[in-house]
Amino acid sequence: IEDAWFDCRGFVKKSITELFYNVSDDFIKYYYYEIILRCNLASASDIIRLLIIYQYGGTYVDVDTLPYTDNIYHGVNKHIEEEGIVESDSFLLFKTLCFLKKINSEELWSEAVIGCDENELGVDAVGFEKIKRLIEQDLSDFSLDMILPLGETYVYKNLLALGSLRRFKGVYFNNFISSHQKSKAIRIILRTMKKRYRFLEKNNCIFDYYVDDKTTCYLTRLLTWRTELITRDYCVTPVLTGPGLIVEVLLGLAYKVFNIDCSVEPHIIAEYMQNSDFGIALFQHNIDTPDGAYSTWRK
């Protein structure tokens, strides 16, 4: 993309290399590990976004994330609630596609939108026709000012706020992060990431494949780093650089700071953190987008 495209839209394009000037050389090494040895742009991006949010503060949003738009579907959402329909990922993506067709002034019921049939949406043919009719009604008087702005984001000074969805209890995403500059929580997350990469190096799992010797510890789950994208088990990246890493650090802080008894299971605390009053979970986003649907880490 040419610089002019960014300039006319008020974007400032910056080189990521300057992010590594003020931190340990380890992070540029980890970045190149992911790019060169694994071709893993997801982990490389995870590292960069944490460095950005730590050094600059503010709000980070993935390019394939859209604003929260489900509020525009008054009629269809009421119908879904009355009929007890469970919205699958396909259903939510379908609603997003319809919305995108509307704002681009394209034919609503094009082949691109009807790519998923009623079976994928969890309804029969009659129910599908009714849903299409209700969506058309909801979008008939749509205007861009109906999309809720992000508004002010309140984040505790040394914590961070993280993307989440109300329908997934205790689940978080790093597509949407907000933090003050030099947040202590982000610093601890980066330090923990460094410890995990060093564990991989110590066990010779960066340049060689892991051979299971039956000994296990808390970080043994990371040792298949080299083969993760080959076997497609996708269990390393989230806890090495992604949302799993962030949530595990937050849970550890919760246990320590509030002296929570170890009998309280982590998933209970993770669900509790989704309470809007705590300012940790961010819900004003939509990850059910055409580009987001292709993410390896959601499969």
Segments (PLM) and residue ranges:
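Glycosyltransferase-associated regions of secretory-pathway enzymes
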Residues: 1-46, 59-299
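Active-site nucleotide-sugar/metal-binding loop of Leloir-type enzymes
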Residues: 49-59
